Amino acid sequence: MIELEEAREKMTQHMKSQCETEEVALLDSLGRISGETIFAETAIPHFPRAGMDGYAVRAVETRGATAESPSCLKVVGSLVAGDSMFYCNQTNNCAIKITTGAFIPTDFDAVVPQEWTDFGQDHVKIFRSVTAGQNYAEIGEDIAFQQKILAKHQQINSRMIGLLAMQGIDKVVVLKRMKVGILATGSELVSLEEPLSVGKIYNSNLYMLAAFVKASSNEVIHLDHCSDDPEELAKRLIEISPKLDVLITCGGVSVGEKDNLPLAIKRIGGTELFHFVNMKPGTPVMGSKFQETLILSVSGNPFAAMVNLHLFYWTLLATFFNCVELNLKERTVILAHELAPSRLRRFYRAKEIDGKVNLVTKSHLSSNLSNTLETNCLLEQPAGVLLKKGALVKVYYWQT
């Protein structure tokens, strides 16, 4: 039995890095990993623009303005967002009525908010002075020319898509998705469209694990079920592995009579990286490699399977895409109550709010899944340690 960190290290040492790219539509890049660094070709804004509704002025001509002694300027025109041209022959004591986002002509260097005026049409009274640059967005105030707006190996979010759209970019080069297969094992499993009979259960883990992978913006290209028979398992592994970057198997890794997955992997010439990790639930988790495909074999119990996948998958993903943002999201918080020692390193269903974490259920069976709906994280308890109320503990947040 090895520690979780050592097991993850053994997996990442054999995890290849994605170098292949593809071009996708801008909206389709959401959640994907950038395949190139992009620099701004256009400053934003690319013209001086008004920061609010009001009057474009020369700031010096508002100096000393008060309600009792306002500055009075001639309104020589108006500009709204989208207007591109304005000609003004008058050079002194004038103002332009203007809306937020509108182009500010040369020689005007500030905008007086309309609330500081009498809303005049031909002439406007200004009751407060402004300084040069006030409510005036200069060229490049948001994005400078040649500013980096997207780095290679960065996960693309909605804000980045907004910046790319500001540049008129409608297609993005991204790294190709990780190709993942999921194989659930067990003769007791039946497909969802079949009626249940005594001794049988629906193949729910298959869908839970597939949903987990899809939520991470990766591709499930094989979804299958296999019996516990070692010959059939070996045949199925040989068939599907070459198409995949990672194969996730579920069940068949413990020490029961029908737990034949380790045997099947050995028969096909696979390399076992580890089997059994100091963690609960999901102790019998196994990592292996067959040809170029990495295999993560998780527990057949639903909660244990989710814990195994959560604690291994994000590390593999971060390695595959060379993107640290994809790693496990963890935080040190305060334990709200005492936890008795556990022989193995333990991961509990928990809920963190405002820096404090509670167990939300008294049931911690690895076969139960419904009580995870009230949780937002896993609480870690080191092996053999009594955790007292107020202790600092690590939590790992659900990310799908």
Write out the residue ranges for each language-model feature.
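Short, hydrophobic/aliphatic alpha-helical segments
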Residues: S29-A43, S84-K97, G287-S288, L294
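Helix-rich terminal scaffold detector
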Residues: M1-L4, V172-V298, P302-N308, F312
